[in-house]
Amino acid sequence: MAYSIKLDSFEGPLDLLLHLIDKAEVDIYDIPVAEITEQYLATIDKMQELQLDVASEFVVMAATLLSIKSKMLLPKKEEHVFQQFLDMDVDEIDPREELVARLLEYKRYKMLAENLREMEIGRNQVFTRPAENLSPYVREEDHTVTNVTLYDLINALEKLVKKTKEKEPMTTVSRDEISIKDRMTEIRQAVRSGGMVRFSELFTQGATRTEIVTTFLALLELMKAKHITCVQNQLFQDIIICENGTEGAHTDGL
């Protein structure tokens, strides 16, 4: 009758050591090296019996544990001579000290990784919805024509750039670049011919980032020269661009 043995997967030798220490319910600051070493070697033997690849780092840790075990089994007098032979500090406190420090550091990182994983799971369970148009809930008397600030223009530009990202054309057609000065002339002509023009109408469908930025800078230059005025009739509505001094006539009823 066939049977299978399941072994826990470990990310490395320190992960395996922590598992054995937790399973044995021993103090990490006072590791019973002989007992843990036997369990560690037995686990590696099982991995090899199951024809699992045992990374070299597991073997290195096994050698480290055996070295610590041998030091702790030596009588104090012989240990003193052994340390002198290896030119080591005879006042070494505990051969387990370095291993304990590595285990504690690994345990901290493991706990942090687990916390981040839980936060990611929690965030994936949160769903947000897009912003709503709140203009129907604004009091009628607040729907006054106001001068548009640079902040309002930047917000409108960000929305256009976002739409450009979402609707990138499948093919790109090269166009002749237009200067800011030429774009200023085009905007003034559009305003004069129609009496006014909406902000969104200045940006044709499929406009490139360069064209969007050029148009935006042209608008700023025209506002700076006081050739045009930008107004907004209601909150969240499109920005209206008209000749300076005519904004009231062109925004009534919009």
Swiss-Prot record:
Keyword hit for Cell division: yes
InterPro entries in the record: ScpA, ScpA-like_C
GO biological process, one term: chromosome segregation
GO cellular component, one term: cytoplasm
Keywords, in A-Z order: Cell cycle, Cell division, Chromosome partition, Cytoplasm
Cellular compartments annotated: Cytoplasm
One Pfam family of this chain: SMC_ScpA
Keyword flag Cytoplasm: yes
Primary localisation category: cytoplasm
Function: Participates in chromosomal partition during cell division. May act via the formation of a condensin-like complex containing Smc and ScpB that pull DNA away from mid-cell into both cell halves.
Subunit structure and binding partners: Component of a cohesin-like complex composed of ScpA, ScpB and the Smc homodimer, in which ScpA and ScpB bind to the head domain of Smc. The presence of the three proteins is required for the association of the complex with DNA.
Family stated for the protein in its record: Belongs to the ScpA family.
Protein name: Segregation and condensation protein A
